Amino acid sequence: MWLRVCTFLIIIVGGISGFSAVAGVCPDWDNTRSKKEIDALRQQLEQWDDVYYTEGKSPVADDVYDQLREQLNQWLGCFQPQSVASVRLPDHGKQLHPVAHTGLKKLSDREQLVQWIAQREDVWIQPKIDGVAVTLVYQHGKLESAVSRGNGLQGEDWTEKVRLIPEIPHLLTNVPSLLVLQGELFLKMTDHRQHIQGGVNARSVVAGEMRRHQPSPVLSQIGLFIWEWPDGPKTMPERLEKLTEMGFAMTADYTHAIGSFADAEKWHHYWYHNPLPFVTDGVVLRQTKEPQGRYWRNTSADWAIAWKYPPFHQVAEVIDVVFSVGRTGKLAVVLKLNLLKLDDKSVSRVNVGSLSRWKQWDVLPGDRVSVSLAGQGIPRLDNVVWRSTERLPIVSPSEHDFHAFSCFRYSTVCQQQFLARLVWLSGEHGLNLTGVRDGMWLRLMQHGLLEDVLSWLSLTEAQLNAVTGMGDKRARDIYKSLQSARQMPLSRWLLALGLPVPRSAISALNHVNWLALQQWTAQQWRQFSGIGERRAEEIMAFLKHPAVVEFIARLDAEGIHR
């Protein structure tokens, strides 16, 4: 969690180009409400910090924590601009850095990136490895201390743990008497693809290991990437060569000169999509020329910026909870979200599932949820990561009001299920009526022309023509399409009305009349493919339901009984 290991910047320069769902617009809260929300979120973050520091593990995904911490500071900027959420340090082991750790401004707007590169000479690009920052201090070639980033000025003493990491040398030759290096401790991965796998909480694994009282085998899985050498060689090639000689060759392998935004974009894309030995959360652009280390501060550096990747988990505010009823009476719940970007997709809705699932999630407007992309790029609700302090309850539909035999007739309450029945009826699984889809059914419903799912059979061309915006030709075509249903066999009508016979058993309806179907037993139905005991009972219940019996009688009166 980056605020625990690096400096927080209350001003996010350049924005994040839609990647984060943390909005820059201040909420419409009074002072009382804003204080409640800020205090509650601060307390939640502090609780997570306690777990992080005492147990060495993260209760939430790293990128989720980062976004909520960013949200807190955004609220502070709106309502308490004199306050900044400070970085907490543990109560033990505070140690000063010989050279301060700077922060990184974050840019993602193309024009700003182009301008930043154009205004500088000798620019290089590196992956922004997602680990924990550390200072290494060598005295006369001997590793004397290792300090976590902390607040950029002081951090925890990690010396003993760092000495147990195989990749970090204890002794160096041909180096200055005082050598200060800053870098990233990271969890070594095999063929990690950031755009597919995300952060996998690798940062928390490393941080947890560094805070364990007793070392574990995880130490052997930790690597180090040096990204700063205060007061080091003046040119980047010389710097990289010296680091390689010291044993830090990875820096040279993943540091490349760039001359344009196109060069930066190429590496940004390549490292996001191709396998790497570490987790990344973006790239870092840096110029070789840097001030002397004594002038560094724990604020944003002028000589380097970060161009981040979109978080694998996006935190979004819930705007509304939408309930829908399907043809069979199944209730589904969808969350409307503040528009966010997941990879290259704009997302404003995420499916929750059933009504009972929504109740389990306990999510309401104003809450924050974590969303990611599942298979085939479908948005997935991962978790409710923050609940607002003032939550207005929502009255949801009753599951008892909707079922397989509800809403064959129109009413205000039944509008969704009734429309779904008509869409199924006119679709490819039913009567396949040309030009009659949900929009047409909705217009007929709004004009009061549909009392039940068969009312349309008796509509005249004149009635259709009277529908607003229909027109003579359109009315004629729709009338012709509706009347074509009279030529359909009874088996198609039964399927259109919702008879729950699977496709694999449709042949069961061939050459069998209505009375015979009603008298079939469960055993007879179960002889067909895809029909088990439960499905057979559902079919029999459908065929004997009073509403269905009435509809079949009406069809018979219309001459549809084959």
Curated annotation (Swiss-Prot):
A Gene Ontology biological process noted in the UniProt record is:
DNA replication
Q: SMART domains from the xrefs?
A: LIGANc
Catalytic residues in the record: 128
Q: Which Pfam families match?
A: DNA_ligase_aden, DNA_ligase_OB
GO MF annotation: an example: DNA ligase (NAD+) activity
Principal EC category: ligase
Q: Which Gene3D superfamilies match?
A: 5' to 3' exonuclease, C-terminal subdomain, DNA ligase/mRNA capping enzyme, Helix hairpin bin, Nucleic acid-binding proteins
Q: Which InterPro entries match?
A: DNA_ligase, DNA_ligase_AS, DNA_ligase_B, DNAligase_adenylation, DNAligase_N, NA-bd_OB-fold, NAD_dep_DNA_ligaseB, NAD_DNA_ligase_OB
Q: What keywords are annotated for this sequence in UniProt?
A: DNA damage, DNA repair, DNA replication, Ligase, NAD
The EC number of this protein is 6.5.1.2
Which reactions appear under catalytic activity for this entry? NAD(+) + (deoxyribonucleotide)n-3'-hydroxyl + 5'-phospho-(deoxyribonucleotide)m = (deoxyribonucleotide)n+m + AMP + beta-nicotinamide D-nucleotide
Q: What does this protein do?
A: Catalyzes the formation of phosphodiester linkages between 5'-phosphoryl and 3'-hydroxyl groups in double-stranded DNA using NAD as a coenzyme and as the energy source for the reaction.
What family does the Swiss-Prot or TrEMBL record give for this protein? Belongs to the NAD-dependent DNA ligase family. LigB subfamily.
Stored HAMAP family: DNA_ligase_B
Q: What is this protein called?
A: DNA ligase B
Q: What is the lineage of its organism?
A: Bacteria, Pseudomonadati, Pseudomonadota, Gammaproteobacteria, Enterobacterales
